[in-house]
């Protein structure tokens, strides 16, 4: 039977590094910052709330006051308002992406 020879330069199981995968060593602080900035999360939450409140609110406000009980027109207005909120979110997201690209270009020019 073959036996394994212990090499002095090889680390034993107790001497191995504390790194497991991509986690930091025992003495280091881990980076707990979120991958997505807080302002992006807040914008998403605001538009999610708007996507729920604005169409439903516009339906119930207009069904009896403006359209005199005609729920078809009030429903159509609610659908239009949902699309308005969606388009507004896309525009805000595109503008935010463009400003990030401009900041990256300015950062490269300064170097």
From Swiss-Prot:
Segments on the Cytoplasmic face: 1-39, 95-111
Transmembrane segments: 40-60, 74-94
Topology relative to the membrane: Multi-pass membrane protein
Primary location: endoplasmic reticulum
Entry's localization field: Endoplasmic reticulum membrane; Endoplasmic reticulum-Golgi intermediate compartment membrane; Cytoplasmic vesicle, COPII-coated vesicle membrane
GO cellular component, one term: endoplasmic reticulum-Golgi intermediate compartment membrane
Keywords linked to the UniProt accession: Cytoplasmic vesicle, Endoplasmic reticulum, Membrane, Transmembrane, Transmembrane helix
UniProt motif (Prevents secretion from ER) ranges: 108-111
Stored InterPro entries: Vma21
A Gene Ontology BP annotation from the UniProt entry: vacuolar proton-transporting V-type ATPase complex assembly
Lumenal compartment segments: 61-73
Pfam families: VMA21 (PF09446)
Summary of the function given for this chain in its UniProt record: Required for the assembly of the V0 complex of the vacuolar ATPase (V-ATPase) in the endoplasmic reticulum.
Family the entry assigns: Belongs to the VMA21 family.
Protein name listed in UniProt: Vacuolar ATPase assembly integral membrane protein VMA21
The species this protein was found in: Pyricularia oryzae (strain 70-15 / ATCC MYA-4617 / FGSC 8958) (Rice blast fungus)
Gene name for this UniProt entry: VMA21
